[in-house]
Regions:
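C-terminal beta-signal and adjacent terminal beta-strands/loops
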Residues: 114, 217-226, 251-298
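Gram-negative outer-membrane beta-barrel transporters
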Residues: 4-9, 109-112, 130, 134-227
Length: 298
């Protein structure tokens, strides 16, 4: 249900889900309060509950290779659904500086997680002799941070958009990421950078021609590196920062009425910001991959 007038709106709702791996019905509530003190200022407070079912994920369907042995993922017995309670406060601001239209969004967020999914390697292999890692319910976790996004339309042919997120992601209790090194325990969540952002610049000097420059920034993060060809013993690595810049040119050729042919070309990852320390050989860690998916490509 939603109640609103010109300045205020209040939305209250919920969702019921039934999953075949969960014995009970899951209720996820949500609430939203909006206040517009002026036409160009939008203030909002939001709460949302959510869940993630104890199921196999896409990455579980791919068999990894660690130290020359296959690694498969299984679900622990009595694995519970992961639950979340998320809160956010945001200010959405609009202003015009002469002919330049701008928009600034500032948002703070906090998420409390229960029955968080985590992975641990089991001592015994499966019937086929594969090394097995088990998805189980670890302790709770918290994610909080600040998101800032800005947009500006300088002219009809030039627009700029950029965003930056600062966040912290921690388990309530330290977790050993690899059973071979139980002393290496971390509260920090693996593969979650504290800083990441993006930008997009679009140029349309003539009607059918568009040039765009985009970028993605990924800050340093913690990634597990299992023993193999790269390292003798398992170690958690702090990755380097990455700044990926892409360029694209596009031109539209009208063919007939509503039919248009677009020809485009460009460079992906112009800065060649790419992982430098891949494992090699039969005993590599195939899961030790991070950062942009491609090197400089044309």
């Amino acid at each position: 249900n939603e109640w609103k007038n010109k300045q205020w709106s209040f939305l209250l709702g919920g969702r019921l889900d039934k999953h075949n791996l969960v014995n009970h019905i899951i209720f996820s509530p949500r609430a939203n309060l909006r206040f517009n003190p002026t036409e160009n200022v939008n203030l909002r407070i939001t709460y949302a509950g959510g869940f993630r079912a104890p199921q196999a994920f896409d990455e579980d369907l791919h068999v990894g290779v660690v130290g020359g042995e296959r690694l498969v993922t299984v679900l622990a017995d009595n694995l519970k659904e992961e639950r979340s309670n998320s809160f956010s406060v945001s200010a959405d601001l609009y202003h015009k500086f002469g002919n330049v239209q701008t928009n600034l969004l500032i948002e703070g967020f906090y998420t409390d997680l229960d029955h968080v999914f985590a992975l641990r390697q089991l001592d015994k292999p499966d019937a086929q002799g594969n090394t097995v890692q088990e998805r189980y319910n670890a302790y709770g976790a918290k994610v909080l941070g600040l998101n800032i996004e800005g947009k500006a339309m300088f002219t009809r042919w030039f627009t700029l958009q950029a965003g930056l997120t600062l966040q912290q992601s921690h388990y309530d209790e330290a977790i050993a990421w690899n059973d071979e090194v139980p002393e290496q325990k971390y509260k920090k969540m693996m593969r979650t950078p504290n800083t990441y952002g993006y930008f997009t610049a679009s140029f349309t000097p003539v009607k059918r021609f568009t040039a765009s420059v985009t970028g993605n920034y990924t800050g340093s993060m913690l990634v597990g590196h299992s023993a193999g060809s790269g390292v003798e013993d398992p170690v958690a690595v702090h990755t380097p920062k990455f700044m990926e810049v892409n360029m694209k040119l596009a031109y539209d050729f009208p063919i007939y009425k509503y039919l248009t042919l677009q020809v485009n070309g460009g460079i992906q990852n112009l800065t060649n910001s790419y992982q430098k320390d891949f494992d090699k050989g039969w005993n590599r860690d195939s899961n030790y991959i991070y950062g942009p998916s491609l090197p400089r490509s044309y």
